[in-house]
A protein has these predicted regions:
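Bacterial Sec-dependent N-terminal signal peptides
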Residues: 1-24
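Glycan-recognition patch characteristic of GH18 chitinases/ENGases
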Residues: 23-122, 207, 212, 327
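Short, well-ordered coil/turn segments that N-cap beta-strands
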Residues: 26-28, 53, 85-89, 126-128, ...
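A cross-domain feature marking catalytic cores of carbohydrate-active enzymes
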Residues: 34-36, 59, 91-95, 134-136, ...
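Conserved, mostly hydrophobic/aromatic
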Residues: 55, 91, 132, 189, ...
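Substrate-binding surface in catalytic domains of secreted glycosidases
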Residues: 65-73, 116, 137-262
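Active-site and adjacent substrate-binding regions of carbohydrate-active enzymes
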Residues: 133-166, 172, 288-330
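Glycan-binding loop/region signatures in secreted carbohydrate-active enzymes
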Residues: 230-299, 320-330
Length: 330
């Protein structure tokens, strides 16, 4: 067949495929969390699959009896669209809000049934694994759950027997139940390198996710916890926390990056913005996100985003900034 006889559409398709293959062939991960309720009704043509390697659907949690009542079938178009772009889809359990039902469900007897149900949903709806985001009260905090470790080990065993992934979202300093043996079960770990301060610490009115924090968190996982670099992913926030000018001032609500840059012209180029009445919003702008991406490419295996719907399209996009740095170094 002569090349000149091929239609232009063929070359456009070929170029698109090649670029996609280049994006996914690299071992560097770009992981994004995405709200599960929005995924169920998303216009998949507007989801930036081409700039991601993994999407975590947040959150999939059972009721007190261990039953999952989400409409998983409604996620099928989203999952298929992701797979078309070679993006893996994981169901994330837990979340920042306290999920007290897991304490009972992680106990002997109920734990095995919970794992069975999780694996069933993953296999039935062709997801790629489970992301464990059990936070305060389980993996860290004043109290932890003694069954966290055995749950992770048994979950990993069940998922890996089906060639599925098990990952985690863990804080800067996880609790003592997160042992080296537990850490070794995860295919990779998303370090939640944010919320170092916030409304709960009004005396620390500063950036909750500085570049310095990111360096310290990566160093802790590499040097203290001895986690191999190819299992670590650096988390970055697409939101900010605000503080008043004095300790007596009420803390203003947090804002998404989308809200910040849509309201204040030029806010994408800095890490804080002075709001009316003396308040200051602290977040990560494009330069810091690019610097963190460079840090991640040098020291760990990827970068994670909380969360994708907090971003904006176009030149102000933080995901675009991440992708520009990551693709330039591939």
């Amino acid at each position: 067949m002569k090349l000149k006889s091929l239609p232009i559409a063929f070359f456009v398709s070929l170029i698109s495929f090649t670029l996609s293959a280049q994006n996914t062939s690299s071992s560097f991960k770009i992981v994004g969390y995405y709200p599960i309720d929005q995924a169920m009704k998303a216009d998949t043509s507007e989801v930036p699959f081409d700039k991601l390697t993994h999407i975590m659907l947040a959150f999939v949690n059972p009721d007190s009896l261990g039953n999952f009542k989400q409409n998983f079938a409604a996620l099928t178009p989203f999952t298929k669209a992701a797979h078309t772009h070679n993006v893996k889809v994981l169901y994330s359990i837990g979340g920042g809000s306290y999920q007290k039902q897991y304490h009972a469900l992680l106990k002997e007897g109920k734990r095995q049934e919970l794992i069975k149900n999780l694996v069933l949903q993953v296999t039935r709806y062709e997801a790629d694994g489970i992301d464990v985001d059990l936070e305060s009260g389980y993996a860290f905090g004043p109290e932890t759950d003694p069954n966290y470790g055995i749950f992770i080990k048994e979950l990993a065993q069940s998922l890996k027997s089906k060639n599925k992934l098990v990952t985690a979202a863990l804080p800067s300093s996880p609790g003592n139940v997160v042992t080296n043996e537990v850490l070794s079960q995860f295919d990779f770990i998303n370090i939640m390198s944010y919320d170092h301060t916030g409304p709960w610490s009004p005396d620390r009115a500063d950036n909750h996710a500085s570049y310095s924090d990111a360096m310290d968190d990566v160093k802790y996982y590499l040097n203290t916890l001895k986690v191999p670099k190819d299992k670590l992913v650096l988390g970055v926030p697409f939101y900010g926390h605000g503080f008043g000018p004095a300790l007596s001032d009420p803390v203003i609500p947090w804002m998404t990056y989308k809200e910040i840059v849509s309201t204040y012209a030029g806010a994408e180029w800095v890490d804080h913005w002075h709001l009316p009445n003396g308040y200051i919003m602290h977040y990560n702008g494009i330069p810091t996100i690019k610097n963190k991406t460079q840090l991640a490419m040098k020291q760990v295996a990827g970068i994670m985003i909380w969360e994708l719907t907090y971003d904006v399209p176009g030149r102000k996009s933080l995901l675009n900034a991440i992708y520009q740095v990551a693709s330039a170094k591939k």
